[in-house]
Amino acid sequence: MRILLTNDDGIHARGIQALIGELGSIAELFVAAPDRERSGTGHSITVFDPIKVIKAKLAGIKAGWVIGGTPVDCVKLASSKLVGDNIDLVVSGINHGPNLGTDVLYSGTVSAAVEGVIMGSPSIAVSLNSFAADTDFSFAARFTRQVIQNLFKNGMEKKTLLNINIPYLCPQDIKGIRITRLGVRNYENLFEERHDPRGNTYFWMGGGVLEEPQEEDSDVNAVQHSYISITPIHFDLTDYHLVEQYRKSFSQFSHLLGEADDNF
């Protein structure tokens, strides 16, 4: 089995190092991860600057690269050039902090996994619900190994994309596993205005998560109630139940485009 590891916390982050230590016994590991913290970069790619690549010297891996780009750059470059398209699984994480609900749209961790699927490899994103500096990733890494072994034992489609969030609790205090859907995460969205020595204005974004009621089957609710959340997701954002409605409502505009198109 050939696994590509990546993240958005940087190649030296403790989460990805824990995965290297845990997965080396079950797979041939390749690592392509950012050269620094790249959290919150979403699905951005680097198109107007060169992407610098340096070989990484890490124990327990087949090959590794420090990438001067985003998490999506890492997966795209590894799949296209560095490793090739014979990657059996992309694992993104373990993220230092959760990636729940609508936050997946901002998440570099989840976006890297999405890119893995786009490039033809099944993928999982793993996040641990802790921001503490002394966070212990060992249980999350062990759980990830068990998930991977189960997926390959039972078969895994190339379009598989799982977003896993693990509560930061002692294993015996975790109540179980829930297969969930994405919830909603809203923030205070505070912007602190400051001025540099030359008088130019800049802002620091801040504000915490708003504690709001969540649907019982959501990932947010699961982690709040001490369950591991596993959410199957995909990158097709089409709102299918509105497609037919808007086909009808916009058909009246066809005459503005010339001959009417019955397939509008």
UniProtKB/Swiss-Prot annotation:
<dbReference type="GO" id="GO:0005737">
    <property type="term" value="C:cytoplasm"/>
</dbReference>
<dbReference type="InterPro" id="IPR036523">
    <property type="entry name" value="SurE-like_sf"/>
</dbReference>
<feature type="binding site">
    <location>
        <position position="95"/>
    </location>
    <ligand>
        <name>a divalent metal cation</name>
    </ligand>
</feature>
<dbReference type="GO" id="GO:0008254">
    <property type="term" value="F:3'-nucleotidase activity"/>
</dbReference>
<feature type="binding site">
    <location>
        <position position="8"/>
    </location>
    <ligand>
        <name>a divalent metal cation</name>
    </ligand>
</feature>
<dbReference type="Pfam" id="PF01975">
    <property type="entry name" value="SurE"/>
</dbReference>
<keyword id="KW-0479">Metal-binding</keyword>
<dbReference type="InterPro" id="IPR002828">
    <property type="entry name" value="SurE-like_Pase/nucleotidase"/>
</dbReference>
<keyword id="KW-0378">Hydrolase</keyword>
<dbReference type="GO" id="GO:0008253">
    <property type="term" value="F:5'-nucleotidase activity"/>
</dbReference>
<keyword id="KW-0963">Cytoplasm</keyword>
<dbReference type="InterPro" id="IPR030048">
    <property type="entry name" value="SurE"/>
</dbReference>
<comment type="similarity">
    <text>Belongs to the SurE nucleotidase family.</text>
</comment>
<keyword id="KW-0547">Nucleotide-binding</keyword>
<comment type="function">
    <text>Nucleotidase that shows phosphatase activity on nucleoside 5'-monophosphates.</text>
</comment>
<protein>
    <recommendedName>
        <fullName>5'-nucleotidase SurE</fullName>
        <ecNumber>3.1.3.5</ecNumber>
    </recommendedName>
</protein>
<feature type="binding site">
    <location>
        <position position="39"/>
    </location>
    <ligand>
        <name>a divalent metal cation</name>
    </ligand>
</feature>
<dbReference type="GO" id="GO:0000166">
    <property type="term" value="F:nucleotide binding"/>
</dbReference>
<dbReference type="GO" id="GO:0004309">
    <property type="term" value="F:exopolyphosphatase activity"/>
</dbReference>
<dbReference type="GO" id="GO:0046872">
    <property type="term" value="F:metal ion binding"/>
</dbReference>
<feature type="binding site">
    <location>
        <position position="9"/>
    </location>
    <ligand>
        <name>a divalent metal cation</name>
    </ligand>
</feature>
